[in-house]
Amino acid sequence: MPIIIDKDLPARKVLQEENIFTMTKERAEKQDIRALKIAILNLMPKKQETEAQLLRLLGNTPLQLDMHLLHMESHISRNVAQDHLTSFYKTFRDIEKERFDGLIITGAPIETLPFEDVDYWEELKKIMDYSKTNVTSTLHICWGAQAGLYYHYGIPKYPLAEKMFGVFEHEVLEQHVKLLQGFDELFFAPHSRHTEVHAADIEKVEDLKLLAISEEAGVYLVIGQNGKHIFVLGHSEYSCDTLKREYERDIQRGLNIAVPKNYFKYNNPDEKPLVRWRSHGNLLFSNWLNYYVYQETPYIL
């Protein structure tokens, strides 16, 4: 089934070239189908890139999704044209009286800042508070997951001695949780971050369950309140070349950055990346939508 997006959204062309079924809002309005209403709070600087990454995964399920893009009103985005935000995005004030089946809160490259020093922290707190009663399930990604764990459960983040950067092996800890249906016992996922959360802090909270962890990269997947909150501490949505472009960007800036681990063939940045997380990423998003959104949400929001 398709994802319903604006016919002029640039990501639509990218998805169509990959044979991912999209539908315009005009066509969807003629159908007698209750599509799942999903919002993406896009905190990433390169918004169009993140749109394509997430919509690619969301569009690979049997469910019809009505997509809504959100940005922070209290933050000036410098890496995206204002007319793109005006044309395709809403703010929290625009939607605060609505309800959603699902919400995705993305990462943001600001993890070294204390949460309270982030210029849109107060607005983000309002959105996370809103999600408690107006969203069936919220999926938090990377910094968004750290922010959610901190706001909802008081879990702190800790600085790393060096950037966690690469593709790492993870172990499934809970075999019979719906979010992990179909997962191999060991799977790979990308990470790109300067901070981490500790498993010991999560294990102290009764409402949280640690689902997957990496010996090298640490906590990866946490579930709260039986699926009301999902926290993904990595980037299963990343495209095949995302880490490559991050690495090349940092090299050009003169930063002391290591080659992303377990990513390039022969660990040689002149070789092409090895994609080992695509099937897991698709399964993670599909399971979230099926078990924690579609099967839990009321027909009438």
Swiss-Prot record:
Belongs to the MetA family. Transfers an acetyl group from acetyl-CoA to L-homoserine, forming acetyl-L-homoserine. The keyword Oxidoreductase does not apply. Pathway: Amino-acid biosynthesis; L-methionine biosynthesis via de novo pathway; O-acetyl-L-homoserine from L-homoserine: step 1/1. CDD domains: GATase1_HTS. It is found in: Cytoplasm. It holds the Pfam family HTS. This is Homoserine O-acetyltransferase. GO terms for biological process: L-methionine biosynthetic process from homoserine via O-succinyl-L-homoserine and cystathionine. The lineage of its organism: Bacteria, Bacillati, Bacillota, Bacilli, Bacillales. Its EC number is 2.3.1.31. GO terms for molecular function: homoserine O-acetyltransferase activity; homoserine O-succinyltransferase activity. InterPro entries: Class_I_gatase-like, HST_MetA, MetA_family. It catalyses: L-homoserine + acetyl-CoA = O-acetyl-L-homoserine + CoA.
